[in-house]
């Protein structure tokens, strides 16, 4: 289904029956609702997945209009109200994790639990944020110049280097998703949702009163540290570190990720 908002049009995939609190999945950069298909097909809980603007079938209505993290939070909130959903178990991976934290900070009463995979609270130092934003602007230009070349190079990112060994079929599906995007929309998404554009959310995270589940792959040293830093901030948080996985745990170690979901929601 599609829901058109003032600044974006969101594509939403949902279970036919939402008779209990659903798990809402948010994918990472270059992903889509298809990134969660395998996980969603193997859980008993009702679920929802959304294409983040600029990805898959979700679009920015005007590529030249300003759009911020808060705009996505507001549009997601309105979408949930239209679907008559009052509570969610929110699960976000990487970029989707940052959007999940941002949404939870603005609409905490909507959150039953928060599962964040390989993500962070943003960048604290203003100068470091500016440096990162400039880097992402350069990447967005490369997307607009040649999406095929960008997706090929993106697959060689050290965060993803063992994915094909661990889940060949899932990795091939992921490559297909990456190639399917509209290059102007994807480039705009990176400009919009760059971590350099994101507010630093440490203070908000400290105030969360719902269960927080932090998931990291054992090979992803940088994000294990991010997870441990978050763990120290909130007594409601717990961290899972998964063997034989790096950045994308739900793809590289699907059974372990499903075990976590089963422990939490069954």
Where would I find each of the regions flagged by the language model?
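Gly/Ala-rich beta-loop-alpha elbow adjacent to hydrolase catalytic centers
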Residues: 92-96, 100
């Amino acid at each position: 289904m599609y829901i058109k908002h003032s600044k974006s049009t969101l594509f939403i995939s949902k279970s036919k029956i939402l008779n209990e609190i659903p798990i809402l999945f948010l994918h990472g950069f270059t992903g889509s609702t298809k990134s969660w298909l395998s996980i969603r097909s193997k859980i008993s809980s009702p679920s929802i997945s959304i294409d983040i603007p600029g990805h898959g079938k979700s679009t920015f209505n005007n590529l030249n209009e300003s759009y911020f993290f808060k705009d996505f939070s507001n549009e997601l909130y309105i979408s949930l109200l239209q679907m008559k959903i009052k509570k969610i178990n929110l699960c976000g991976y990487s970029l989707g994790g940052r959007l999940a934290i941002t949404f939870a900070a603005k609409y905490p009463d909507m959150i039953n639990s928060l599962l964040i995979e390989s993500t962070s609270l943003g960048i604290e130092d203003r100068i470091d944020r500016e440096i990162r934003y400039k880097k992402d602007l350069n990447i967005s230009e490369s997307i607009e110049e040649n999406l095929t070349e960008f997706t090929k190079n993106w697959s060689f990112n050290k965060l993803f280097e063992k994915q094909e060994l661990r889940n060949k079929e899932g990795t091939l599906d992921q490559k297909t998703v990456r190639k399917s995007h509209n290059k102007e929309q994807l480039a705009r998404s990176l400009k919009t949702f760059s971590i350099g554009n994101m507010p630093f959310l440490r203070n908000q995270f400290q105030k969360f009163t719902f269960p927080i589940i932090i998931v990291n792959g054992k090979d992803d040293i940088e994000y294990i540290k991010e997870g441990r830093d978050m763990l120290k901030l909130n007594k409601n948080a717990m961290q899972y570190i998964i063997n034989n996985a790096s950045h994308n745990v739900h793809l590289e170690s699907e059974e372990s990720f499903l075990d976590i979901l089963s422990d939490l929601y069954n």
